[in-house]
Amino acid sequence: MASARPPSPEELLAASEKAFEAGRFEEALHRADEAIRRDGRSLAAHHYRAAALAELGRLEEAREAYEAALALDRDDLDLLVGAADFHVNLLQEDEAERDLVERGIALARRGAKLARKADDPALEGEFRRLEAAGLNQLGLSREALRVLQDAEAALPDSVEVMLEKGFALYELCRFGEARAALLRAEALDRDEPWTQHYLGLVAERAGDEEEARRRFGRARKLDPDAFPKPIALSPEAFDAAVEDALASLPDAVRRYLSNVAITVEDHPSDDDLLAPDPPLSPAILGLFRGAPYGQKASMDPWSHFPSAIVLYQRNLERFARTRAELIEQIGITLIHEVGHFLGLDEDELWARGLE
């Protein structure tokens, strides 16, 4: 009896695609690996392998798989979309790594250039949106807004473009414009949880607590994993959490903090946010006020005031589901602000792991 004919690389690719579209990512990965064993230079197989690994949460393997695919063809538009999206979105869900975000931006820019040559304005617009997402990740929201002008012109009905625009405007403290962009996104898709979340943040800044609660609640209903109910403490309980966080810090950090007043406010004030140019993010967890350590002789009159670190309770509470998580985040924030007290800028903080 003749043995069954082994599936061809094309059949394995079709099986991988079918499994991927059905959400069976382990099977999709298995079929893609089989296809690669049959044809090691199959770009589609390498792409499916990378995408399946990403969906399975095996992010470092997925990053390596995307690089292997790009080594085969760095000009394939479908691959560039997937790789750029992976670097600026999925890979950054927990915490942005600057070099990886920059890699995603570079891929998006290359894709936009190739899409323009191919006379595909919609695809060029998608690449520009991904570039803007990466720029927003790096805190370069003004540059992101400029890029989003091209994306919006190409994709005027894109929820993702309007949401990214709303996020950039929010980060730049242009809250009225942010609300307008987010309402446009909501009109296109009422069930996008991130739109509801950012509308809640804008309402909170405006002092509309009722709308903020409604928006946050809707975001939580639409995506409870992304938007769990935050811990909410009384001022006294929050102060106690700060004390516990201080007690958990290394001696060297506590020694520096002995020279710094620590205060708590609900939200950053407009004055604090708009003092630098570009403005600070409204989502900041803390802020160092005063002159860095050893610079009290500055001609700046503000430097003669005592140094202080302000913790923003509502922003910190959004990062925590439990008191233990809140204490941990307060400690991280204090260490970050100690870096500012020591005169480190944002790039130096990032390099030292204090960002």
In which residue ranges do the predicted regions lie?
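Structural marker of alpha-solenoid helical repeat scaffolds
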Residues: 38, 72, 114, 118, ...
